Regions:
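Cytosolic covalent-transfer regions centered on His/Cys nucleophiles
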Residues: 1-201
């Protein structure tokens, strides 16, 4: 059975306007500790190590001030997300500068499908400027939780579906990124959004 949204993220795992340090290692360590503190992991040190090991292979900074450090790990028993909106942005390797919106995603080692699915949903949601704006202006963790409930939970997509179209025009687009899978999902969502905007009928 797929995990429910309530088992993936809780308001206790959401930090707003937090100063978690000067480096991405500091941020990862702090969020791993937070995940342990709320009972989602029994080994924050191992969790931080596994996230950092994945980060060392390929930076997880994304355009727009976002980072999604992630890993598959034995330090947790079920998929978990923690979120921090940083008061002091930190460099996660994105070309456009440091990140202030940090999502840590960790799934069990035997949960490859769940890991990929969650990463896909999260990355696709974060393509949209309105989502980023709401994350940056949210006043409390509950507001963030409700915002993310769409793409991560079972309540459907964050944005309403595109209107029905006729089948006269068919478009095929292929995207891929050697940097990381999250970039690929974000590119795919951007392509789909461009088609919706430019081919309304």
């Amino acid at each position: 059975m797929a995990p429910s949204f309530l088992t993936i993220l809780s308001t206790d795992a959401i930090l707003l306007d937090a100063n978690l340090g000067e480096s991405k290692s500091d941020v990862i360590t702090a969020l791993a500790q937070r995940i342990q503190d709320i009972g989602r992991s029994g080994d924050a040190e191992q969790l931080a190590h596994d996230i950092q090991a994945r980060e060392d292979k390929s930076a997880t900074g994304l355009p727009g001030g976002i980072a999604i450090p992630h890993c598959r790990t034995e330090a947790i028993a079920f998929p978990t997300i923690a979120f921090a909106r940083l008061s002091h942005p930190v460099d996660f390797g994105a070309n456009d500068g440091p990140a202030d919106l940090i999502f840590v995603l960790a799934t069990p080692v035997d949960g490859l499908i769940s890991h990929t699915k969650l990463l896909s949903r999260l990355a696709r949601a974060l393509v949209h400027d309105e989502v980023l704006a709401q994350l940056r202006t949210a006043e409390d963790p509950t507001e963030v939780f409700q915002l993310l409930n769409g793409p991560l939970g079972n309540s459907g997509p964050l944005l309403p579906p595109a209107p029905a179209r006729n089948n006269k025009l068919k478009l095929l687009a292929v995207t891929g990124c050697p940097t990381g899978i999250a970039h690929t999902y974000m590119s795919a969502e951007a392509l789909e959004q461009s088609v919706r905007n430019n081919f309304p009928n």
